[in-house]
């Protein structure tokens, strides 16, 4: 299962299509990767 927007992740492949794993301090979450 992939992680949806703002879901926790450790790498880009954890996230659903068009989402990438972002690191903000100690928090890692899936955010839009800019693709359609």
Curated annotation (Swiss-Prot):
Q: Classify the source by domain of life.
A: Eukaryota
InterPro entries assigned: Huwentoxin-1
Q: Which UniProt keywords apply?
A: Amidation, Disulfide bond, Ion channel impairing toxin, Knottin, Neurotoxin, Secreted, Toxin, Voltage-gated sodium channel impairing toxin
Q: Where is this protein primarily located?
A: secreted
Q: Molecular function terms in GO for this entry?
A: ion channel inhibitor activity; sodium channel regulator activity; toxin activity
* Annotated positions of the Phenylalanine amide modification: 36
Tissue specificity statement from the Swiss-Prot or TrEMBL entry: Expressed by the venom gland.
Q: Could you tell me which cysteines form disulfide bridges?
A: 2-16, 9-21, 15-30
Q: Where in the cell is it found?
A: Secreted
Q: Name one GO cellular component term.
A: extracellular region
The role this protein plays is: Neurotoxin that selectively increases Nav1.8/SCN10A peak current (EC(50)=894 nM) and causes a large hyperpolarising shift in both the voltage-dependence of activation and steady-state fast inactivation. Acts by binding to the domain II S3-S4 extracellular loop of the channel. In vivo, causes spontaneous pain behaviors (that gradually subsides over 30 minutes) when intraplantarly injected into mice.
How does the record comment on the protein's domains? The presence of a 'disulfide through disulfide knot' structurally defines this protein as a knottin.
General remark: Negative results: has no inhibitory activity on the late current size of Kv2.1/KCNB1 potassium channel but does slow its kinetics of activation. Also shows minimal activity at TRPV1.
- Which family would the database say this protein is a member of? Belongs to the neurotoxin 10 (Hwtx-1) family. 62 (Vatx) subfamily.
Recorded protein name is Beta-theraphotoxin-Eo1a
Please tell me the species this chain comes from: Encyocratella olivacea (Tanzanian black and olive baboon spider)
